[in-house]
């Protein structure tokens, strides 16, 4: 992409309404624009990152054998009355009425809808296990939306649902989702710690939230510092293997880690004092096992091998896709702007032409751009006739992990400069080696294509 042809409305001043770093930088970098309280338009740069994150979520869900689908944003209130949650959910639910005077609602979550789909189409244990998921816009009418996309009213969310014959099968699905989420967050450059949590309005006997440690987090968290040393890494997992998935769950949940809602002071005090930590965290996902709560209420049953009709065991599993942008920025920034991890960066690298209009510099930039594009990478070429300082400031603000700087002086020596946004370290090399270096970096950080 050539910056001269791109829509990137960067702001020099920080908007007064932005209270946290992620909100400030998303506004300044031209990623979002507020349309109403807690509701945002996603501008091209923000949309690219949103789709990169969505792509990683899709890839990891399908790696685990989960089936993508899509449900509507508007639901009938009848299903929610049937489950008993229509009145219980509270004022966060946006209730509407159509022209035929039927009660409808804007989806805050989809347990009822997916259960209705299941009960209409599945009747035999032979069709189990089954896990389906969607990535769709949701709406919760927050009383005080704030912090940009971190606590908006409209949000983009992955929500998945498993249907199993037995509790044991459903708990394996729970463990499988925990493994999937660990892989997903690590690919995004995040350490998201699974913590015992409260089921809230969704309910459930067993639930973990995934939290990213950050000073601006809304949740107070208590944890054993040993958990921050754990990484999933490149290990291979057979998602059908019960023992493997259970072992990962035990590895990542055996140490104390809880939100303030489920904190147990006595258990926390059993952790060696030097390892006790109290911090704040941003919730970026949650997994639930809630047994037969919805299947019993909505009549989602299957016939077993001996002819009995039994309610299925269920769980639901969510990832806040739009919220993740804010969480990543909160975890990865400096005073110049965003520092995107390689896995979710909107463009793989930036190309800065220090002397636009110089024949040699222009030609070298065009060759770099063509070479990177030819091997499937997505560079952002700043070909504007702007001062070098302004170009560097824009690149630092939008946070691309790598920058290739091209100027007449370096080209006389046959070199360009490759700079890491995270460390600030620069290295001179030939244009050909610069392409090889960027290609090698992203060979280890596969990213979905942007838009």
Curated annotation (Swiss-Prot):
Quote the PROSITE patterns the UniProt record gives: AA_TRNA_LIGASE_II
Q: Where are the transmembrane segments?
A: none
Principal place of residence: cytoplasm
The EC category is ligase
Which PANTHER family does the record cross-reference, listed alphabetically?
A: MITOCHONDRIAL RIBOSOME PROTEIN L39/PROLYL-TRNA LIGASE FAMILY MEMBER (PTHR42753), PROLINE--TRNA LIGASE (PTHR42753:SF2)
Protein family (similarity comment): Belongs to the class-II aminoacyl-tRNA synthetase family. ProS type 2 subfamily.
Q: This chain belongs to which protein, by name?
A: Proline--tRNA ligase
């Amino acid at each position: 992409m050539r910056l001269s042809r791109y829509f990137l409305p960067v702001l020099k001043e920080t908007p007064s309404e932005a209270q946290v770093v992620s909100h400030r930088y998303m506004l300044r970098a031209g990623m979002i624009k507020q349309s109403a309280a807690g509701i945002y338009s996603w501008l091209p740069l923000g949309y690219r990152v949103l789709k990169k994150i969505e792509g990683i979520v899709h890839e990891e869900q399908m790696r685990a054998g989960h089936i993508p689908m899509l449900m509507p944003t508007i639901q009938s209130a009848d299903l929610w009355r049937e489950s008993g949650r229509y009145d219980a959910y509270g004022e966060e639910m946006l209730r509407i009425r159509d022209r035929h005077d039927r009660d409808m609602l804007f989806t805050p979550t989809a347990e009822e809808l997916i259960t209705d789909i299941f009960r209409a189409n599945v009747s035999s244990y032979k069709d189990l296990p089954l896990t389906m998921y969607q990535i769709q816009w949701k709406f919760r009418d927050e009383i005080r939306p704030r912090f940009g996309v971190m606590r908006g009213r409209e949000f983009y969310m992955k929500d998945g649902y498993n249907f199993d014959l037995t509790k044991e099968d459903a708990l394996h699905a729970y463990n499988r989702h925990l493994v999937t989420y660990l892989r997903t967050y690590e690919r995004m450059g995040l350490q998201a710690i699974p913590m015992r949590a409260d089921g809230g309005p969704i309910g459930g006997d067993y639930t973990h939230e995934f939290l990213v440690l950050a000073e601006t987090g809304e949740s107070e968290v208590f944890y054993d510092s040993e958990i921050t040393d754990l990484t999933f890494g490149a290990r291979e997992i057979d998602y059908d293997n019960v023992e493997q998935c259970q072992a990962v769950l035990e590895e990542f949940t055996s140490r104390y880690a809880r939100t303030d809602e489920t904190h147990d002071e006595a258990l926390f005090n059993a952790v060696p004092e030097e390892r006790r930590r109290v911090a704040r965290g941003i919730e970026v996902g949650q997994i639930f096992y809630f047994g037969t709560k919805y299947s019993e209420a909505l009549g989602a049953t299957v016939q077993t091998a001996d002819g009995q009709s039994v309610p299925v065991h269920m769980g639901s599993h969510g990832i806040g896709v739009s919220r993740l942008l804010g969480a990543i920025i909160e975890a990865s920034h400096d005073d110049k702007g965003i520092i995107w991890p390689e896995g979710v960066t909107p463009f793989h690298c930036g190309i800065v032409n220090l002397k636009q209009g110089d024949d040699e510099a222009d030609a070298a930039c065009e060759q770099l751009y063509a070479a990177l594009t030819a091997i499937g990478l997505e560079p952002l070429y700043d070909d504007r006739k702007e001062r070098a300082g302004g170009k560097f400031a824009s690149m630092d603000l939008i946070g691309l992990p790598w920058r290739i700087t091209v100027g007449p002086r370096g080209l006389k020596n046959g070199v360009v400069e490759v700079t890491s946004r995270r460390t600030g370290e620069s290295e001179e090399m030939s244009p050909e080696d610069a392409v090889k270096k960027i290609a090698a970096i992203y060979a280890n950080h596969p990213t979905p294509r942007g838009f």
